[in-house]
From Swiss-Prot:
Protein name: 3-isopropylmalate dehydrogenase
Subcellular location: Cytoplasm
Keywords: Amino-acid biosynthesis, Branched-chain amino acid biosynthesis, Cytoplasm, Leucine biosynthesis, Magnesium, Manganese, Metal-binding, NAD, Oxidoreductase
Alphabetical list of PANTHER family matching this protein: 3-ISOPROPYLMALATE DEHYDROGENASE (PTHR42979:SF1)
Gene coding for it: LEU2
Length: 362
């Protein structure tokens, strides 16, 4: 049975990296009988605005709702500015419509050969290995707001409910329990100032205590966590659990630790991946890179996002692990794009990973 994957390439570099992820998935299907894919391409972001006037056309959303998983490249660019219709609105809408409440962003080194590229000293960066679990459909990004209407006043509101925090805490706990021994959980908030953070801390505490007493829970204020991240990131190893706004900021800060935004994948899930078949949307942590010439963008974050899709949504864990192994082999061999000090093109890196994954699975 073929897996139905909706591909939303998006804008600029998103279109290039989506092609490379598909290249790797098609290579897998050549050697793995269980891995058969049916790809459907749709518009999102600026490309969709140009073609339809909407950042997320109805047909794209309808197709995504019927798919086994969604692969998304990247959206945005200066062409679409900050007008009333913006590419990023398509992202927010698809997350909300598909109820993708949990965003998972791993932060680790795909290969230790990349340690010298980190802005941190190698002795501080080495061993960094955590997953940011960010709430994705609530909080200040979706709260009530008022624009400045000439009166010089604008505001946004942060609101969380107990069930919203509980389900994300359960996601973090599930991920922690996939390891032996279980990973610690770091819950980040601003409970010394914000009412929403006090509810967050209380709910996380109760949920772990009542449902997962075997897990170690640590609370950390977000500003303190941001300092730890640049001073000694391994202190946060485990599962980092936090709200939409704080997660957006801390995961972007974390994404530079491995040396390039072009390395880190992400998954946005609508349910626990307890059967490895959770519905999810998979995209790189980086943006559309409109300033990069064609053929220069690093496709690894997109390819590793596809690996997460194989493991969490398509029940193809062996194939997902093979992709991760192939990425390490290719990086260690010195085949790299310019952001990693190499001279290879986007497609050359994709070709090398596709070849390596076939050899691993053959």
């Amino acid at each position: 049975m073929s897996k139905n994957i909706v591909v939303l390439p998006g804008d600029h570099a998103g279109q290039e990296i989506a092609q490379e992820a598909i290249k790797v998935l098609e290579a897998i299907s050549e050697v793995s009988p269980e891995a058969k894919f049916n790809f459907q391409h749709h518009l999102i972001g600026g490309a969709a605005i140009d073609a339809t006037g909407s950042p997320l056309p109805d047909d794209a959303l309808a197709a995504a709702k019927k798919a086994d998983a969604v692969l998304l490249g990247a959206v945005g660019g200066p062409k679409w500015g900050t007008g009333s219709v913006r590419p990023e609105q398509g992202l927010l809408k698809i997350r909300k419509e598909l109820q993708l409440y949990a965003n998972l962003r791993p932060c680790n080194f795909a290969s230790e050969s990349l340690l010298d590229l980190s802005p941190l000293k190698p002795q501080h960066a080495k061993g960094t290995d955590f997953v940011v679990v960010r709430e994705l459909v609530g909080g200040i990004y979706f709260g009530e707001r008022k624009e400045d209407e000439g009166d010089g006043v604008a505001w946004d509101s942060e609101k969380y409910t107990k069930p919203e925090v509980q389900r994300l805490t359960r996601m973090a706990a599930f991920l922690a329990l996939q390891h032996n021994p279980p990973l610690p959980i770091w819950s980040l908030d601003k409970a010394n100032v914000l009412a929403s953070s006090r509810l967050w801390r209380k709910t996380v505490e109760e949920t772990i205590k009542n449902e997962f007493p075997q897990l170690k829970l640590n609370h950390q204020l977000i500003d303190s966590a941001a300092m730890i991240l640049v001073k000694s990131p391994t202190q946060l190893n485990g599962i980092v659990l936090t709200s939409n706004l704080f997660g957006d900021i801390i995961s972007d800060e974390a994404s530079v630790i491995p040396g390039s935004l072009g390395l880190l994948p992400s998954a946005s899930l609508a349910s626990l991946p307890d059967t490895n078949e959770a519905f999810g949307l998979y995209e790189p942590c980086h943006g559309s890179a409109p300033d990069l010439p064609k053929g220069k963008v690093n496709p690894i974050a997109m390819i590793l996002s596809a690996a997460m899709m194989l493991k969490l949504s398509l029940n193809l864990s062996k194939e997902g692990e093979a992709v991760e192994k192939a990425v390490k082999q290719v990086l260690d061999s010195g085949v790299r794009t310019g952001d990693l000090g190499g001279s290879n093109s986007t497609s050359e890196v994709g070709d090398a990973i596709a070849k390596a994954v076939k050899e691993i699975l053959a």
